[in-house]
Amino acid sequence: FINASYTGFKEHVSLLRPLVQSGQIQVANHTYSHPDLTTLDAEGVKEELQRNEDEIMSMFGVSSKPYFRPPYGRYNDAVLKAAGEIGFTRPVMWNGTTGDEAKTSSRVIYMRCIRYMLPQQIVLGHLNYETIIPILDKVKGLIDDRGLTAVTVRDYYGDASEEEIKAAAPSPTPTPEENTPS
């Protein structure tokens, strides 16, 4: 889930594009500039998602529809309606977060990986912070030891109906002890 306003994606598009086009990684929409969508009117929601979609298409040649992740996990019926009107019908939430923002220690990140990296779980992590890099081998070992496989959002949801996805979706509000993920 990318924000195209973050320059790192454009700087590394030549490395990422082949992975996206081959299906090894999936790009989905996290809005252009990362606003709380519940503070925007319908046109603002559409503009954030569509501008990001246009950038994704330009960089990677693929559409991110129908998936989007609302920044901070915040959405309401008005956001879902506006997003749906332009083809973003599947908000993707998470069951836990690595909490890998810049202020979090590698030890705490790994403890969160132990807690949340379980079967059938969506775990939120970030590409724009380096705090997880020193423990990537350890995290990969945890994933391997647990027999887990990383999959794309498309693989995770498969052919589930909108009603099935909505019924199975985790709460959009992180638990109180967690930092608010972005």
Regions inferred by a protein language model and the residue ranges of each:
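Active-site beta->alpha N-cap acidic-glycine motif
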Residues: 1-36, 44, 48-65, 156-158
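Structural recognition of the beta-strand scaffold that forms the well-ordered cores
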Residues: 1-2, 26-31, 66-70, 90-95, ...
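Acidic-and-aromatic substrate-binding clefts and catalytic sites of carbohydrate-active enzymes
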Residues: 3-11, 36-40, 69-75, 99-104, ...
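C-terminal domain-boundary segment and adjacent tail
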Residues: 7, 131-182
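Solvent-exposed, polar/charged alpha-helical surfaces in well-ordered, non-transmembrane soluble domains
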Residues: 14, 43, 47-50, 54, ...
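Basic- and aromatic-lined ligand-binding clefts that recognize polyanionic substrates
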Residues: 58-83
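Short helix-capping segments at alpha-helix termini
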Residues: 59-62, 87, 143-148
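His/Asp/Glu-enriched short active-site or ligand-binding loop at hydrolase and phosphoryl-transfer sites
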Residues: 74, 79-116, 148-160
